[in-house]
Structure formats: C-alpha cells, structure tokens
C-alpha cells in the first residue's frame, strides 16, 4: 500500500446559517452554528484515509479544543496525527462561514497555527518525506514551506501532488518544477492560466 504524507492546513469550520448576508453595520440573528473539521490539508488526509490509504498528516495546530476536533475526525478514518505540531501561542486555524437561504456563502479564514509552519519544521521531520510514497500539498500554509517540502520530496524521488488553492497572486514557477500532478478546479485553472477555461480539453 502506498504511503501518503499530507503537509498542509487544519481548520475548524464554524458554519452559520443566516437569512441573508449582512451588510456593513447590520446585525442579524443566525439560525444555528455547526463546528465542522476542515482545512484543505485535513480534507485531503480525511478523504485518502476514508479510501483506505495509509496516511500521515503533518501541520500545526493550537493547544485548544479545536485541535481535538481535527484529531478525532482524522483518527476516525485511520490517519496518523502523532506528528502534528502544537503551537501554544496560536489557535488552531478557523474558518467562519456564513451560508444564506439560497446556499451562497461568505468565508473568513483565520490562519492561526497554519501560518507558523516553516521550512525548518519540514527539515526537522524529513524522515516523514523519506518514508512516504506520495506527498499531497495545498497553499493554505506559507508558500515558502510548500516549495521547500515539494523540492525535498522530489529529491527523495517521491510523487508530489498539489491542490493549488488558494491561488497566490504570483504563482512561483519554481514550484511547477517539483509537481507531478496539479489538480485545480475551473476557477483556479483560469487564475493559473490567466484566461477563462471553458472545457476540459483546454
């Protein structure tokens, strides 16, 4: 069985149902709030674990109850979370998601501990890169950290897969040279190409 290492973000999504999106200065009453494990990195790890893969999640969380929500969710599908870094001075990443009656949403992301993951953290845990077969990355952690992780993974002969979200204003050409598979959605593909994408063949 292939070993998958996910290096990336862990967020807890606070999903709030609202009758309509508030405008500046407006106070509205929400229906309810639900705490949902999320973060693009954790979502990748959860999906791979649910499919039966051998998965390790590497990232940074806070020393709080939100990190417990993430760990419990990932553990439920067999993902190894023993290498997560705990930042006592930061909260676990959070996302405030308002959803109106038509299903439209607005999202505010608080990076929290995700923003603290560094190249030095990756270097200190290179045994995880050496031991995996596939590296999965996204861009909700510092870009320099992603580039370093992808570069080292390629040097170790690993397959590197990138979910290029959120797409940075200037996508570093260097990162392309370390990627084997890139999986943007339609909007992200258009941002990367600098032009609309209207069909799969394009």
Q: Model segments located where?
A:
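Active-site-proximal loop->helix
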Residues: 65-77, 95-103, 125
